[in-house]
Amino acid sequence: MPPAELPSTVTIKVNDCIIVGKAQPASEAYPKPLDLFYGLRYGKAGRSKAPVSEPLKSASGGIDATKPKPPCPIPMAPQETSEDCLRLNIVRPSKSGNGPMPVVVYLHGGGFNFGNPLDADMAAFVARSEKDIMSVSVGYRLGALGFGPGEEGDDARSNLGLRDQRVAVNWLREWIGWFGGNGEDITLMGVSAGAHSVSPPG
C-alpha cells in the first residue's frame, strides 16, 4: 500500500519564529491557490481574566498551523474544545504580487453562546474575490467563559469575549504584515452575534 500523500505546506519566518501553513491548490470549488494558517494564538487569558496579546515567537520545532485547533467550549459541543482558544485562522491567495492586501476579519455568530470561527468557508470567500484579499476568522470565549455574570461595576470580568475580539484586531494590526496583509486596511464583518460585535464604536 503506497504511503499517504503528505499535504503541501507553506512557510513564513517572522523574526526567529517559523510558521508552517497549508498550501491548497486551485480547484473547481476554490478557483485560486491558497495558503491557510490555522490556530495562530493571538492572546492568552486565565479563566475570568482579561485577555493579553500573545506575540508571535519561536517555539520548539516551529508553529504547526496546517490543521485547525479545537474551538472555544460551548454547550453540547460536537467536537473537541479547549479553553486555550484565543486563536485565529488566516487565508490568503498564494504568491500574490499586488502589495499588502486588504484584510477582512470574520466574527462568527451563535448568540455569544455557540459557534466556531470555521463555521463560514472563508477560503471560498478569498478564492472567489475579484481582487486579492486576506481573511481572518477569530475565536473568542463564549457563554459563561466569555460573558459570565459579574458584580455591579466589576469591569474586569465583563464581556470578556468582546475583549478577546479587540485584542485579536490589535494583534492583526501588528503582525498581519508578515503574512502579506495591510494592518491599516482591516474590515470587520460578522453574522448574528458577530455582526453585533462589530457595531459598537471604538
Region locations from a protein language model:
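Gly/Ala-rich beta-loop-alpha elbow adjacent to hydrolase catalytic centers
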Residues: G190, G194
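Gly/Ser-rich "nucleophile elbow"/oxyanion-hole loop immediately N-terminal to the catalytic nucleophile
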Residues: K95-P100, G150-L160, V167-L188
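Non-catalytic accessory segments of hydrolases
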Residues: M1-A156, L162
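Extracytoplasmic/periplasmic beta-strand context in beta-sandwich domains
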Residues: A123, E184-I186, S199
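Short alpha-helical patches at coil-to-helix transitions and adjacent helical residues
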Residues: C85, L162-V169, A195
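Amphipathic alpha-helical interaction motifs in eukaryotic regulatory proteins
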Residues: H108, V126, R166-R173, G177, ...
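Short glycine-enriched nucleophile-adjacent loop
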Residues: A195-G202
